[in-house]
Amino acid sequence: MTKENLENELKTLPNSAGVYQYFNQEGKLLYVGKAKNLKNRVKSYFAFTPNLHANPRNSLRIQKMIEETVHLEFITTNSEADALILENSFIKQLHPKYNILLRDDKTYPYIYVNFEEEFPRFEITRKLVKKSKIKYFGPFFKGARELLDALYLYYPLKQKASCKSPCIFYQISRCLAPCDKRISKEKYLEILDEAMHALLNPSILIKNLEKQMLVLAQNENYEEAAKVRDQIVTIKDLEVKVEMDVAKLEDFEVFALAFEDSMLSTLRFVVQNGKIISANSKITPIKNDIQWDQNEIYKQLILENFSMDIPLLANVIYVYEEFEDRVLLEEILSQRFDKKISIKIPKIGEKRRICDLAFQNALLNIEKEQKNHDFTIQKELKFYFELENLPNDIEIFDNSHLQGVANVGAMVTYRINSWDKSKYRKFHLKHKNDYDQMREVLTRRALDFDKIPPPDLWLIDGGKVLLDLAKKIIVSSGANVDILAISKEKIDAKAHRAKGGAKDKIHSLKGEFSLSINDKKLQFLQKLRDEAHRFAISFHQNTKKKQDLKSSKLANLGLSSGVIQKLLAYYGNFESIYKADFKDLTMLVGRKAAQKIKEN
């Protein structure tokens, strides 16, 4: 594929809405975008004289992307709204290199009341409940279960879905037994109304619980009083720390973005009855080669939070600033929920103040991350080793084996300021030498870049040889990943450890570095390397134990350790040995040994 092919492809673009995709020489997807007019939009990325090249009017990052592009594909749609939905779906599924992906697939819980029931009660859901008389509260980004427990602790409402006679909750004064008509429906609904008011005003719930705790303590029921005290502490921790009430008892949502030092901060306020009942913030590292696209982020953020399978509580969304596809998003959401949804940018008044507050909190969240010690170290690493990316997302690799037995590899992940153990990976390896083992691990990880986006930095436990190996793999993948390697300093061909700390060398594509053992950058990289080493050793030991157990079974059959090792070397694992053809086993270790294996 060449630029000449690309120029021919540009001539086929229609004057209709749709989605376009850019690909590089290796066929890797670089970018997905949507357009009202595909021909006009896509051609705006290019200049055509004296030959095809990136339009210099675009940002440097966009120009870099276009220089990599050798092929484009497009899909036409009936409308720009359809194109936007398809674009968002492609970004989530395909993880293009130059698109920003907000990695948050969580669905948050709502507390709801079903008024179709004779005696309604509080329940929790993460999806839309298909009933007509439902009152929702939320979403709650943390502590929904704790809030529900606290409500039932103070307000004696029905808790069980079905009950024909007074249950245990009635016996402990936590229910008034409406199932047995021991409370009128009118009185029950009054209590429910008080509970719903307290749910929207946690300070009321806290005061009520404090009164209950005092009564329990006065009655020397200290165990129950302690439980109530713990509930109070939990609810205080859940309270949104932003004290701002809107004069009108309105329901609406607020979104704001902030971007600084390669960090994107998103913030969402949920306002019900004029009060901020929950807030959700998220920090996402943005790689240096990805275009900061405010419009793209607002689209993802709002579409993800207003999906069809969750309750719609607010018809109005306020955003901190204007973005390109705001009106188009209004159209999509209105069609999705079959009612008018407005997305507004308030200019003055209390709505403007709450949007400003959301933006200020988004900025504060970045500042909190920056005050973290490791963030400072990451900035120093970028400057000192001349890295292209700020290393917010780091993958660290190590291998472990014992004389060619139980060969394993390990990858650990450090994201922003903590270990992301959900991304740790283990590898069973075929090869027996360090170089081929590392090549196997890194290649397998690179092949997954389309499913799990690449990090900012790879840290390899090894020297320059393994650094060069990693570089080849990254270049062939087309990803933008910085690489460092860490190895023990060698004296007389032996690893040297000085008193007070390990003497390690850092290898980068710029050269080799010997840092002081007290250098914070070295200590940070050693911390990363040591965690990968710990994880690899632990996996190796567990694998070795399993192999030893299986080996002992063969030894009990009378096979020598030499024969067992010969079988493992040939078949790779015990499962393959047991499944092997009798004839093949006979040729390898003799008829007698083969019979023992197949008979057992």
Curated annotation (Swiss-Prot):
CDD domains: GIY-YIG_UvrC_Cho (cd10434). Residues 15-100 form the GIY-YIG domain. PROSITE patterns: GIY_YIG, UVR, UVRC. One of its GO terms (molecular function) is excinuclease ABC activity. It is found in: Cytoplasm. Gene3D superfamilies: GIY-YIG endonuclease, UVR domain, UvrC, RNAse H endonuclease domain. One of its GO terms (biological process) is nucleotide-excision repair. One of its GO terms (cellular component) is excinuclease repair complex. InterPro entries: GIY-YIG_endonuc, GIY-YIG_endonuc_sf, GIY-YIG_UvrC_Cho, RuvA_2-like, UVR_dom, UVR_dom_sf, UvrABC_protein_C, UvrC. Residues 203-238 form the UVR domain. The keyword Cytoplasm applies. Keywords: Cytoplasm, DNA damage, DNA excision, DNA repair, Excision nuclease, SOS response. The keyword Cytoplasm applies. Pfam families: GIY-YIG, UVR, UvrC_RNaseH, UvrC_RNaseH_dom. The UvrABC repair system catalyzes the recognition and processing of DNA lesions. UvrC both incises the 5' and 3' sides of the lesion. The N-terminal half is responsible for the 3' incision and the C-terminal half is responsible for the 5' incision. Interacts with UvrB in an incision complex. Belongs to the UvrC family. This is UvrABC system protein C.
